[in-house]
Amino acid sequence: MIRSALDSKDLAKRGESLIRQSSNRYLTTVRIAFRAKQRRFDDFDGLLEESSVKPVQRAIIELSDEQDQPDLLPG
């Protein structure tokens, strides 16, 4: 899912897809920011492995995967 050598074009496509498929661009941006903040604190707490992927990049990838593959979500 998350590669150490992140492709910037792929990341841009994922971000555009999130925005394009949302009904509210502002709320999507807030979701990305909130998820990035959570990941940043998880990194501080040592819950996540060391990664060269920045929290915002990780958030975009995770939200994009959740949008594209909803059957992976629990519940």
Swiss-Prot record:
Similarity field: Belongs to the RNA polymerase subunit omega family.
Subunit structure: In cyanobacteria the RNAP catalytic core is composed of 2 alpha, 1 beta, 1 beta', 1 gamma and 1 omega subunit. When a sigma factor is associated with the core the holoenzyme is formed, which can initiate transcription.
EC nos: 2.7.7.6
One annotated Gene Ontology cellular component of this protein: DNA-directed RNA polymerase complex
HAMAP family per record: RNApol_bact_RpoZ
One GO molecular-function entry: DNA-directed RNA polymerase activity
Keyword tRNA processing included in the entry's annotation: no
Catalytic activity: RNA(n) + a ribonucleoside 5'-triphosphate = RNA(n+1) + diphosphate
Gene designation per UniProt: rpoZ
Described function: Promotes RNA polymerase assembly. Latches the N- and C-terminal regions of the beta' subunit thereby facilitating its interaction with the beta and alpha subunits.
GO biological process: DNA-templated transcription
Protein name, per record: DNA-directed RNA polymerase subunit omega
Keyword field: DNA-directed RNA polymerase, Nucleotidyltransferase, Transcription, Transferase
Disulphide bond pairs: none
InterPro entries named among the record's database cross-references: DNA-dir_RNA_pol_omega, Pol_omega/Rpo6/RPB6
